[in-house]
Amino acid sequence: MRFKQLDKITEMVPGERISAFRHVNADEDYLRDHFPLFPVMPGVLMLEALYQASCWLIRATEGFENSVLMLKEAKNVKFADFMEPNQTLLISAEILKLEQDTVLIKATGSKGETVAVSARLVIGKSNLASRNEDLESLDVFLRDFLAGQLAKLTS
């Protein structure tokens, strides 16, 4: 993940829900350009935070069964408020439907009691080895690496 959009996972109930947060620091690189006179967290990064939290929930739910989780669709995306420097995005996501190849997630990002972003996400699941058996060792590496990253986010 080039842009890690979660600082900490505060609660996780595998198979059900996750809560996490992302603090918008005043020195974030993107704030210089987005926007110079009114710096705010880009909406796409707010959506990315929802997606990343959702992926951790799926991984924990399935015991890191799949090495690759990809956003297939973002439905009903609503941006309702800005995230300015020194504000914290409180993220919550819940599993609505868990299928063999996809998961439907309902996610929101709030600042305090105000919803800033909400969406329903369709996330696809797979392993690299399902397309090329020679990549099975990479699947194992990725699952182990991601398990270590989750441990850091929950400690």
List each model region and its residues.
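Catalytic strand-loop segment that frames the active site of acyl-thioester-processing enzymes
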Residues: 1-41, 46
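Hydrophobic core residues within well-ordered beta-strands of beta-rich domains
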Residues: 3-5, 89, 103
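Hydrophobic residues on conserved beta-strands that form the core of alpha/beta folds
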Residues: 6, 71-74, 118
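Conserved positions in beta-strands of structured domains
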Residues: 7-10, 75, 80, 92-96, ...
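HotDog/MaoC-like acyl-thioester-processing domains
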Residues: 15, 85, 96-155
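Beta-strand residues in well-ordered beta-sheet regions across diverse protein folds
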Residues: 21, 92, 106-108
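Short, well-structured hydrophobic secondary-structure segments
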Residues: 39-59
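Hydrophobic beta-strand-centered segment that forms part of the acyl-chain substrate-binding groove
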Residues: 54-90, 124-126
